[in-house]
Amino acid sequence: MQLLDGKALSAKIETTVAKEVKELKNSTNLVPGLAVILVGQDPASAAYVNMKKKACDRVGFYSVTHEMPSDISQSAIENTITMMNNNPNIDGILIQLPLPTQIDTTKILELVEPSKDVDGFHPYNVGRLTTGLDGFVPCTPLGVMELLKEYKIDVKGKNCVVVGASNIVGKPMAALLLNANATVEICHIFTDDLKKHTLAADMIFVGAGVINLIKEDMVKGGAIIVDIGINRAESGKLVGDVDFENVAKKCSFITPVPGGVGPMTIAMLLSNTLKAAKAHAKENE
């Protein structure tokens, strides 16, 4: 069994991004800018935003966080997004999800200018992904693909099972795998007999938010396991959706939690923001 080390790869990517930021600044005098909108006091969301800010600082991005109270109105968030859309110093806009229940999340995501949609959640970018065109891809599944590439794991022709059908992870993960010529199956909360599906899989990508959902008897020998889940166990420890200790014995590759997919998500946010900055710089030449 070999670990898919997202922490090590993300550090490599950060070094490359930092170098390219310097080059961009030297040639155009522009610095990539990321705006984050954080609504409410959710500790997990605040921790994620803080990690993103630190990563921006490490690579030399300009970043700003708009913190808003949980009882904020729809129009107040919309006004902030419009302001960021029109701000030439901002290349990427990130809406930290989930948003409070009174907010129409779909409308908010649709308001973000697609060329600044570094999370890849705008329907325009979702459409480009599903039709195999270049655009912004959600950071977590994009990070998974980069991690597989680093370890020279080719998904072409492989039976891939994606567990979880969210717009943020499951659906874009399936689209990326399909674009790379994998045979893809998506399982979700209504799937009957999950074990039957996972046992037939060469590769399992799980992002369902359920501790120990994937157990040893659900995985065939030599399978590749990508654990996208991140949960807080009763002990306070961060764990994924896979029973790591027991499943690791059976598989050929597996991502640890933490240190697997998580760091790659942030690395791809940096990569997407740099991509946006370069595109904006080209437009202004």
From Swiss-Prot:
Keyword Amino-acid biosynthesis belongs to the record: yes
Cellular component annotations (GO), alphabetically ordered: cytosol
UniProt GO BP: L-histidine biosynthetic process; methionine biosynthetic process; purine nucleotide biosynthetic process; tetrahydrofolate interconversion
Pathway where it operates: One-carbon metabolism; tetrahydrofolate interconversion
EC number: 1.5.1.5, 3.5.4.9
InterPro entries per the UniProt record, alphabetical: Aminoacid_DH-like_N_sf, NAD(P)-bd_dom_sf, THF_DH/CycHdrlase, THF_DH/CycHdrlase_cat_dom, THF_DH/CycHdrlase_CS, THF_DH/CycHdrlase_NAD-bd_dom
Molecular functions (GO terms): methenyltetrahydrofolate cyclohydrolase activity; methylenetetrahydrofolate dehydrogenase (NADP+) activity
Pfam families: THF_DHG_CYH, THF_DHG_CYH_C
Superkingdom classification of source: Bacteria
Family, similarity comment: Belongs to the tetrahydrofolate dehydrogenase/cyclohydrolase family.
Name assigned to this protein: Bifunctional protein FolD
The species this protein was found in: Sulfurimonas denitrificans (strain ATCC 33889 / DSM 1251)
